[in-house]
Amino acid sequence: PHPRAKNCTIAAAKLVLEAAVQAGAPEGIIDWIDVPSLEMTNTVMKEADIILATGGPGMVKAAYSSGKPALGVGAGNTPAIIDESADILLAVNSIIHSKTFDNGMICASEQSVIVLENIYDAVKTEFASRGCYFLNDAETEKVRKTIIINGALNAKIVGQSAAKIAELSGVTVPEGTKILIGEVESVDISEEFAHEKLSPVLAMYKATSFADALDKAEQLVRFRRYKNGDLDFSEVETFNLDE
């Protein structure tokens, strides 16, 4: 387990093991490391028949270099597109559920939402009515400086609540705030909100057309070679982005 999530990870593993054994699985079918360390992780990799590595580039590289069959899961930077054909209530609810589960730690949760300009205000109103807080320009700048520090994701915001991240940024938000939303324009790597944030912090973009929305989504996914895909809440046929 990750050192910062050791206790809850082990508790979850114990529950799954107990349920598996009660259902007839062999004792010890699920195991864990009580005191995690890089040395122990490398030892387990050398002894395993197959490795599923979820984590940063270092973890994935170590798995691929172990000499054993390995599946690596790296970072994700999932954008969602909401266009005119979408059910706005469903789209917003789905994003909020995804972004607040485990305080946004799942790498497949949305990191950005791209909204067509003619429904932008309606989508913004729906987010706000459901406990999401839209940062003003000054607040957006403060949160920017908290998301990325020295070119890397700030570990202090990972898995934290929106209120805690606001506090770290020097921003005051209403009690019960679910997500901090920054309205930004750039999808470039220089924009902190364009990165994977692993927390209830969301970037919101305005698109002039569906093609513009797709272009923004493609850039968000590709500028760091993220692999977790994107999500489209429109009711249209799926097609190849390269066509």
Feature map (PLM): residue ranges:
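Short glycine-enriched loop/turn motifs at secondary-structure junctions
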Residues: 44-45, 74-75, 105-109, 150, ...
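Residue-level signal for inorganic ion chemistry
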Residues: 30, 51, 116, 165, ...
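Conserved short loop/turn motifs at secondary-structure junctions
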Residues: 32-34, 110-115, 228-237
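Rossmann-like NAD(P) dinucleotide-binding subdomain of oxidoreductase/dehydrogenase enzymes
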Residues: 1-90
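Residue-level recognition of the N-termini of beta-strands and the immediately preceding loop/turn
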Residues: 27-31, 109, 177-179, 227-228
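Conserved C-terminal structural/oligomerization subdomain of aldehyde/semialdehyde dehydrogenase
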Residues: 171-243
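Short, solvent-exposed amphipathic alpha-helical segments in soluble enzyme
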Residues: 14, 49, 68-69, 128-130, ...
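ALDH superfamily catalytic-core signature
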Residues: 19, 60-188
